[in-house]
Design a protein with these regions (language model features):
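Carbohydrate-binding surfaces of carbohydrate-active enzymes
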Residues: 1-191
């Protein structure tokens, strides 16, 4: 139920330069990839939409719009993620319930002995656990954080996480993510 019917939920968007690609300017794709990597390295949560579909209505829900040929805007301050560079993050909203799912993927592993080799498959994967992952989150106005749950394939059941309140009105919280190998989800449930 974590993935079924999920919708993008980031407050930043990166526009894919499809207009330029259709015009034969494929160099913009490299700029797009470089900008996307930069956002991922800084743990900025963002959605991706093609620039030929970026109507005012489509962009209305975003606080920051990143374009390959534009000045980089300030990132949304709703989430501030601290994690190793090997960890990537994304955000989604489930179809049911008032929740957000913060997904973490850890790419840190012991590399295969042979360069440019994937090894013999999944049984050769040697992930190195992600540690010291945390984030600061601003609770949307008019909402209360009901629960914070941590999911990972290494555990049979989700665990409750306790947020640390950072301000006097309780709207800004810090959440420390437990150690995980490859994948984890933190579910924020509101009331």
């Amino acid at each position: 139920p974590i993935y079924k019917g999920n919708h993008p939920a980031a407050k930043s968007v990166l526009l894919f330069p499809r207009k330029a690609v259709h015009a034969g300017t494929v160099a913009n794709v490299q700029k797009f990839l470089k900008l996307g990597d930069s956002l991922l390295d800084r743990h900025i949560l963002f959605d991706v939409i093609p620039d030929d579909l970026n109507t005012a209505e489509a962009l209305a829900n975003y606080k920051a719009v990143y374009r390959v040929d534009g000045i980089a805007p300030a990132a949304s301050s709703r989430f501030k993620i601290t994690a190793p560079k090997t960890v990537r993050a994304s955000l989604s909203r489930p179809a049911k319930g008032d929740k957000l799912h913060l997904h973490f993927v850890n790419y840190n592993r012991t590399e295969p002995a042979k360069p440019k080799s994937a090894g013999g498959g999944i049984h050769d994967e040697k992930p190195i656990a992600a540690e010291r992952v945390q984030f600061v989150f601003t609770i949307p106005e008019g909402k209360f954080l009901k629960s914070v749950r941590f999911f990972t394939p290494e555990r049979d059941k989700p665990l409750e996480l306790l947020p640390r309140i950072l301000d006097t009105n309780g709207q800004r919280v810090e959440i420390s993510v437990l150690e995980f190998l490859v994948y984890a989800v933190v579910e924020l449930e509101f009331e």
